[in-house]
Every structure is written in structure tokens, then in C-alpha cells.
Amino acid sequence: MKLALNTFVQIKIKNMTFQELQPKVTEITLNSKQSIDEKLLSICQLLSDSIDYYNWVGFYFANHESKTLHLGPYVGAETDHTVIPFGKGICGQVAISNENFVVPDVAAQDNYIACSFTVKSEIVVPLFVKGENIGQIDIDSHVLDPFTTEDEKFLEFVNEEIAKLY
């Protein structure tokens, strides 16, 4: 019976709506017992656990002097992409454009840095603090074209909550 209960809880969590996740994100950001990195990791874990097609969830942070992005907390498969030059790949392009970038099919994208053959799509949303792009949230999916404007709006909300930490 315990296994069935755990399975039910996992299914329930996986079916949470973005609206249901918003207060959970806010709760994490307000947790005074966690460092910023711990909060970011908790948010990555929440999103990975709650949304079926969020298979890799992580943050990159900008170093504007060296014009590079540096990997922050993440949940998912290990990546070799710990430093990304501005302009390179989807994340690097967002560092320059300051705009969301949704890639429905990474195989059709010219300037894409392959992380894994299992990644089919990606969404990257910049993180602004006082008008400056300090980084981004990056989501990889093993599903073709799963991201909608609702994902974009939700991830913008997540980044607005995170921006309050800085």
C-alpha cells in the first residue's frame, strides 16, 4: 500500500499546473535557511520533478567582463558545457539578445551546442536584475516541440522571483 501511495503522490506532482507551482517557487525563494544556490537547486528540482518534459533544468550566470556564461545549479544529466561564450549556442545567443529563445527541434537549429542525443528541444529565458541580464534559466526536453507561451510566462515568473534574491 505504501508503494501505491508514493506512486500516486508522484503522479499528482507530475500533473501540477504552472499556477499550482508558482506559490511553491515563491516559498523556496523566501526560505531564509537556504543559500541562493540551494534555493536555485531546489527550484530546479521542483521543476524537473513537476513537469514531465523538463528533463534538464539549470541556470547559467553571465560574466560580462569575459563575455561568458557559467553553469550554476542544475538538475539532470551531467554536462560538459560549464562555460559558454556569449553568442554560442542557444544560451549564448540569449546572453546577447536578452530575449526568450524557444527551440522546438534542436536538430533544425544551426547555432546549437549538443548536450546529449536525447535532447530534442530547449527553452532559455533570461534572468534580469535591475534591468541587467545576469543569467538565464535553461530547460532541455527529450520531447519535440513541448514548450508553449505558458512555459515562457511561467519561467519569466520564476526568474522574477529569483531576481528578488539579488
Regions found by a protein language model. Give the residues of each.
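Short, Lys/Arg-enriched N-terminal segments with co-localized hydrophobic residues
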Residues: 3-15
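Intrinsically disordered, low-complexity terminal regulatory regions
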Residues: 12-74, 78
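Juxtadomain coupling helices with adjacent low-complexity linkers
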Residues: 22, 26-29, 141-166
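Short loop/turn motifs at secondary-structure junctions and domain boundaries
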Residues: 51, 114-119
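Short hydrophobic/aromatic beta-strand element in the GNAT-like acyltransferase core
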Residues: 56, 124, 136
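Regulatory sensory and allosteric helical modules in signal-transduction proteins
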Residues: 62-68, 72-114
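A short, aliphatic-rich beta-strand micro-motif
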Residues: 121-128
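Sensory-domain boundary capping and coupling elements
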Residues: 128-141
